[in-house]
């Protein structure tokens, strides 16, 4: 039986999800078909009896949005990554992949993703200094006293969007999404393969980290392989134009009924997406309004914790491998960063480093 606390927790995560969906739309992903991913996620939670929901993650959108040169490549990256992760989860290989890479290398990779997020935020601010700067100032002003990411994203997006409308006197003149059911056939090229592998590597780390955190909040066992299966299957909705959804740190984990609260959150977002309201709302929310939030989660919420996990009490080879993984990820992408870190972890002891 759902309680008021369950409903409030779900609503809080919904408020966090709406700006992320608008952010995804700025890269060409479509709102209505993204509802399919949320429904698949809810069905997966119900089928496996887990407490770990999925939603749009800023890091995922920033990675896919920047690695894909156009919407065809972005959708293809999400689809192929979804296939990879669904297979890995179904075979129960997620922990084996983590063990092979090494937890410090994976943590270094995730810290590198934090730097990528900060770089995307800075590029957004450069593209629109007025909106981006207001978003950044608001995000910092809210995050420092509260350390609450939901308040941070809502405040920074609302304030910077209001400033944009005050300055321009009218919403953006963009075409409102008119979705018709259609299949976007995935393409295959070097960029797509690299992007799919990069997203898969990022998903391995986030599923283990975020899945364990949310399950820990609920006092439940974290079935990461199950999470990997249904988050991977949810991303197959990108074949219809949907944005990819991934594991998140969800406040629903702290609700009295975390499973039901998580399912309610995803179904609510699916209904909002199908209603067609978000594409209309997106005319009033410039892409750069999310810049402050991206900077905060990159610099303050992602880099410090993962860098600490990567380097704290590390042996010399582990230290070098984590540093390589972090640096190369920040300069290229998570897949190349992970591979570079693994190579250093293997050869460093042989070379006596």
Named regions from a protein language model:
Residues 2-15, 32:
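N-terminal amphipathic alpha-helix initiation
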Residues 8-9, 219-220, 265, 310-313:
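Short, motif-level signal for alpha-helix interfacial/capping segments enriched in acidic residues
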């Amino acid at each position: 039986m759902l309680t008021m606390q369950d409903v409030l927790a779900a609503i809080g995560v919904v408020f966090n999800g709406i700006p992320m969906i608008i952010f995804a739309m700025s890269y060409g992903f479509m709102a209505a078909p993204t509802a399919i991913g949320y429904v698949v996620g809810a069905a997966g939670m119900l089928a496996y009896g887990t407490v770990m929901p999925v939603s749009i993650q800023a890091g995922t959108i920033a990675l896919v949005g920047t690695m894909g040169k156009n919407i065809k490549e972005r959708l293809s990256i999400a689809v192929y990554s979804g296939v990879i992760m669904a297979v890995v989860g179904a075979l129960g290989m997620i922990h084996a992949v983590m063990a092979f890479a090494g937890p410090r290398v994976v943590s270094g990779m995730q810290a590198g993703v934090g730097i990528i997020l900060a770089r995307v935020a800075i590029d957004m601010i450069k593209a629109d200094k007025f909106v981006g700067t207001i978003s950044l100032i608001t995000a910092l002003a809210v995050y420092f006293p509260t350390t609450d990411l939901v308040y941070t994203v809502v405040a920074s997006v609302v304030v910077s969007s209001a400033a944009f409308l005050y300055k321009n006197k009218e919403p953006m003149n963009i075409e409102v999404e008119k979705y018709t059911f259609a299949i976007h056939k995935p393409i295959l090229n070097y960029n797509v393969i690299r992007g799919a592998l990069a997203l898969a590597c990022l998903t391995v780390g986030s599923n283990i980290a975020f899945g364990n955190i949310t399950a820990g909040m609920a006092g439940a066992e974290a079935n990461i392989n199950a999470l990997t299966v249904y988050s991977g299957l949810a991303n197959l909705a990108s074949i219809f134009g949907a944005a990819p959804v991934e594991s998140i740190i969800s406040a629903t984990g702290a609700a009295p009924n975390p499973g039901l609260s998580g399912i309610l959150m995803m179904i609510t977002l699916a209904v909002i997406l199908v209603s067609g309201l978000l594409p209309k709302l997106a005319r009033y929310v410039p892409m750069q309004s999310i810049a402050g939030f991206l900077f905060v989660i990159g610099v303050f919420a992602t880099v410090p914790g993962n860098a600490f996990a990567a380097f704290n009490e590390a042996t010399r080879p582990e230290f070098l491998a984590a540093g390589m993984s972090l640096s190369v990820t920040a300069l290229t992408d998570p897949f190349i960063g992970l591979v570079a870190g693994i190579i250093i972890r293997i050869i460093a002891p042989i070379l006596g480093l």
